[in-house]
């Protein structure tokens, strides 16, 4: 009865008691129920000095022994001790088990490895700050890794190391620092299903693979991967699981698969799939310059709420349909109000696509910013960026102020769906190729682009920017002062299917096709181009190519159109218009130099001092 009352009034994650209702919804994903009952907890299973149930299913028999004194604790597989919970933790008489060492170590201690270790028991601790100095050694996940148990999850497969505090809502009370060490999962899985464990106390989690190599669950701990720390070959859902709390990857730290092969984390039918190397559900992740996530199949960062600042390098990742959310965001996937920033020192390079529909960066109800100085380059057969704001309210943004270069795809380089993508004033997209039907930068249903930077030297036969509303809200794009869409192979901007392009400034020049193509359609009305400033010049075809159908409109209120390659600067096709909402409007001075306009009925040339012109 007491256990039942406890489960009704409290929720417990990672050995920590939370007031009911304060656990993030993302951590409460329900799984199919089974007959497993919540475990009872004896006094021996409680964290010392508290009444709080812990994650350990059985505390060491040596609980009452004097713990190792001093600031260093030693562990060696070559110890003469036979029992996992024996030894004094000294250089002369080291512990044999990392799990026992972290339990026995005092707050502030450094655990020093004297040899490689193969562990079959999770090393878990609470309310302590511990450093594990591998001294160049590796800790391997052994076969038959023991299950753990708590009231929230019942029996489950744990991470190699779990850290947390017992006082949620307070300042962080625990930390783990890893230095000069390799933790190697060996691509092994305990359990078979790639799903998030349920935390409703009903169990049913023993078939699920482990969450991570290293994990924290309740917002009270910090994990620091210091120089020389490597997490390798994660076999479960992630290498690091962060449900609240903080993760820092310092210069010289790494998460990767080894050179002997890249693990293929294949999910069963109905599974979510693995999350990624770093799996964040709340809390914060800071990846410093010199840190690296590389050489793996799947995903680098899965940000399900919380924040990530990426100042290190993400490279050599191949997307995989078997990941959670499939191939969306092989480098960074942001959702559930998460915010990710690729900082000045951050780079994403060499991401490859299993499918051209897969993406390097993907946001779903979340924000992403690449700041000036950041770089995304060398990506192959994959879309670089996709933004999806499912609330259709444009609250979430994708701001690109860094460099995107040398990326190729048979699809489009970017895409949005009810979202806004901004190429900021320092943003550059250059040297990229997209041969798909949607051009280089594609937008769909209710989406927006804002161009303030430079899009130069790219190749896209269907257009550098392709605006099209296929079945939803109106698509729009704005071009600002200082923006450039220039010297590309292909037309500059295609305005299709009722879309709107507004040019406030900037330059569309030197492209091999037309500067702007406005394609009116009777079944998808309202395509419009409004030019209030800037210039359209030096393009290989018409400055403006306009098909007057379906209440399409071109208004040249300011700026100039001049020096384009075709004999006429403007082409108007589609025959005579009998609709007052279908026209081209040219104000004085907006058409300069050669002032020819090609019409279905013939060619006309405006006088040098022409007055306002309306055609339609």
Predicted regions and their residues:
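Right-handed parallel beta-helix/beta-solenoid
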Residues: 26-100
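Acidic glycine-/aspartate-rich tracts in secreted/extracellular proteins
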Residues: 78-83, 116-118, 136-138, 183
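Extracellular beta-strand-rich solenoid/capping regions of secreted or surface-exposed proteins
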Residues: 118-131, 140-180, 184-224, 237-245, ...
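N-terminal extracellular ligand-recognition/capping segment immediately after the signal peptide
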Residues: 108-144, 234-236, 347, 597, ...
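Glycine-centered small-residue motifs that form tight turns
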Residues: 158, 203-213, 237-240, 271-278, ...
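Solvent-exposed loop/turn tips at the surfaces of repeat/solenoid architectures
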Residues: 130, 135, 178-181, 186-187, ...
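Bacterial Sec-dependent N-terminal signal peptides
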Residues: 1-7
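Hydrophobic core
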Residues: 8-16
